[in-house]
Amino acid sequence: MENKSKYKTIDHVLCVEGNKKIHVWETLPEENSPKRKNTIIIASGFARRMDHFAGLAEYLSRNGFHVIRYDSLHHVGLSSGTIDEFTMSIGKQSLLAVVDWLNTRKINNRGILASSLSARIVYASLSEINVSFLITAVGVVNLRYTLERALGFDYLSLPINELPNNLDFEGHKLGAEVFARDCLDFGWEDLTSTINSMMYLDIPFIAFTANNDNWVKQDEVITLLSNIRSNRCKIYSLLGSSHDLGENLVVLRNFYQSVTKAAIAMDNDRLDIDVDIIEPSFEHLTIATVNERRMKIEIENQAISLS
């Protein structure tokens, strides 16, 4: 279902099993922009909504890309469910549902851009979906390490019955038992499991690390890439960045520029990101961000009025 609105961004609603709904936002290529072969799917990081990536969608659209974003089930954002029931497997289910929807629309040429925790979900999903290339930014490769750094304790080391009810992650209450049980039962938790998922990757892959990232070890990202049997992988560092790519405007702009260059390069079957881009003005980025926040509020208000 497509929700018509006055905004540039198009809101779609996917109905999935259990009468749940996934909201997908579509941004069309800017008029008269360069022609691109691939659509870009943006998989937001944990506790990040679609509208947090308004600026990146604007960068990609200005440079000719058709952009798809979505809010996972049981997460922050517009889709069904609450974050206290989120698991990595639910994140994977949400991604696969979006890809299935794109298949029904005959949108088969696509690259994925995933950040933080969503990168780990994408790594585990690549054997089940067809994509042209993968870009990750501060992508989690060792979930156990990242959780320990973020939460201050290695909760995955505890027996299930000794876990607290909730884990406080950046102000959000993550259901400890359901999340930990899913991690351990389905092998999400360590670097080895990530390597096993990615070993036979045969598509181009660019990984952006941040040199001040305390949640993801750069040497573990390098270890992951060294275990991929393809030679079509490359790592770049976002200098001056921490795991929070939006911590200030300089870091954020570097992130937008870098991944846009990577998308253009990979759309042209290259790993060298020394390419020119069209850069939106600060005014255009501000307008896009404000409009998407308004659109989100309107959608939330419509949902409340219908309930």
From Swiss-Prot:
Picking any one GO biological process from the record gives: fatty acid metabolic process
User: Which controlled-vocabulary keywords does the entry list?
Assistant: Acyltransferase, Luminescence, Transferase
Output the Gene3D superfamilies linked to this UniProt entry.
alpha/beta hydrolase
What's the EC number here?
A: 2.3.1.-
Note one Pfam family from the annotation: Acyl_transf_2
Molecular function terms from GO: acyltransferase activity, transferring groups other than amino-acyl groups
Q: What does this protein do?
A: Acyl transferase is part of the fatty acid reductase system required for aldehyde biosynthesis; it produces fatty acids for the luminescent reaction.
Q: Give the similarity note.
A: Belongs to the LuxD family.
Name of the featured protein: Acyl transferase
